[in-house]
């Protein structure tokens, strides 16, 4: 029997409660054994200023999932030299774990960008894409995407960074304390 592993990639700058909720909902609805949080370098489609360091983002992710044994952090994209594409990551993971079905979890707002992903025609044969519905985003693409529903949330890392003084309710406590202690995003 094949293993079922979810992958939630992102900049996680910072990781927040909606990230946890997406991973939990996908794990439950798809009966996944575990979910890997895959922090990435700034992806080709994003340009973020004021970004936390890789080390800070990784530490916040580890704090967020601490004590949840079916969540793990995978650092391969941060360690890869040069550009890091999902295609390369999945090719490596499948080679390392051939007896595993991978479910790549993306926010509903990212589904419409799938046609622009590097080697998407090959990638859709390698993984099952899972679109987590968020408010006001519905996209149709010519690829099979498993859609799962998540309770409505409007949390985004961008909004948290831009309004850090009022963001405590959207962050796991340990992440909030880390942000305060390290004065990230202007938090003194």
Curated annotation (Swiss-Prot):
A single GO BP: NAD biosynthetic process
An annotated Gene Ontology molecular function: ATP binding
Pathway annotation: Cofactor biosynthesis; NAD(+) biosynthesis; deamido-NAD(+) from nicotinate D-ribonucleotide: step 1/1
EC number(s) on file: 2.7.7.18
Enzymatic reactions: nicotinate beta-D-ribonucleotide + ATP + H(+) = deamido-NAD(+) + diphosphate
Listed name of the protein: Probable nicotinate-nucleotide adenylyltransferase
UniProt organism field: Listeria welshimeri serovar 6b (strain ATCC 35897 / DSM 20650 / CCUG 15529 / CIP 8149 / NCTC 11857 / SLCC 5334 / V8)
InterPro entries: Cyt_trans-like (IPR004821), NadD/NMNAT (IPR005248), Rossmann-like_a/b/a_fold (IPR014729)
Gene: nadD
Biological role: Catalyzes the reversible adenylation of nicotinate mononucleotide (NaMN) to nicotinic acid adenine dinucleotide (NaAD).
Keyword entries, A-Z: ATP-binding, NAD, Nucleotide-binding, Nucleotidyltransferase, Pyridine nucleotide biosynthesis, Transferase
Organism domain of life: Bacteria
HAMAP family the UniProt entry points to: NaMN_adenylyltr (MF_00244)
Pfam families associated with the record: CTP_transf_like (PF01467)
Entry similarity comment: Belongs to the NadD family.
